[in-house]
């Protein structure tokens, strides 16, 4: 079934809000698009509409986290990263355990245009100290990531990257900081080709791997990276040793 990762956020954060009464949600007037508005329906006393004021939203989230609240704030990825200096000072350097949710990432939103596309968000967030980056590929994986963020005592800011487009819902395990092999064949001495993938493009990557398989059966491996920072160095090094091509 085709589902968007942002739908997982909208459906599951309110459920986790039932379990943890310190979870609060901040919206910058895009709640219907980011799906954070669904939190308001179940927990109106823990939902705060900040308006079109992302810088204020980030500052408020830092203050709330100081008092023990687990804050989820949401906007388009392109709009959040436009407040780079506020993220840098109010969250990154101060290691505030806030979850920033950036939706509508990548080019898949199409006709909305480049001003709405989160194209540079990963490079921007990776450049900042102490920020961890999560980029789930499927609806089910996004559910697992949201559960991890809610259940774990975070010690730094996290950036959760979500897509608008529906993608194939592939079942796979999730472990923070680890890459996962999602397609492999019977290799004698490792695969000929290993393809790295992250985020909503995974289904397309697997389709491409199957096309290669038609020419060289069972010689292509796909590894999914739901965590971009910290990256799983071990599986990258292992793949470089085992594969002819990356």
Regions found by a protein language model. Give the residues of each.
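Thiamine diphosphate
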Residues: 1-161, 166-167, 178, ...
């Amino acid at each position: 079934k085709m589902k968007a990762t942002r739908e997982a956020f909208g459906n599951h954060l309110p459920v986790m809000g039932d379990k943890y009464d310190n979870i609060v949600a901040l919206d910058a007037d895009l709640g219907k698009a980011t799906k954070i508005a669904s939190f308001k329906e179940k927990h109106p006393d823990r939902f705060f509409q900040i308006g079109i004021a992302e810088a204020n939203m980030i500052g408020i989230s830092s203050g709330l986290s100081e008092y023990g609240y687990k804050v989820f704030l949401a906007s388009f990825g392109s709009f959040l990263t436009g407040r780079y200096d506020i993220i840098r000072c109010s969250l990154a350097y101060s290691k505030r355990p806030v979850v920033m949710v950036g939706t509508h990432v990548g080019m898949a939103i199409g006709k909305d245009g480049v001003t709405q596309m989160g194209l540079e968000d990963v490079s921007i967030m990776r450049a900042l100290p102490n920020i961890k980056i999560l980029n789930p590929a499927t609806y089910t994986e996004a559910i697992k990531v949201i559960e991890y963020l809610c259940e774990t005592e975070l010690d730094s800011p996290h950036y959760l990257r979500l897509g608008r487009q529906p993608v194939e819902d592939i079942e796979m395990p999730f472990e923070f900081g680890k890459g996962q092999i999602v397609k492999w064949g019977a290799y004698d001495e490792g695969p000929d080709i290993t393809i790295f993938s992250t985020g909503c493009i995974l289904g397309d990557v697997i389709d491409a791997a199957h096309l290669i398989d038609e020419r060289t059966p069972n010689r292509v491996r796909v590894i999914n990276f739901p965590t971009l920072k910290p990256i799983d160095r071990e599986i990258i090094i292992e793949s470089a040793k085992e594969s002819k091509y990356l």
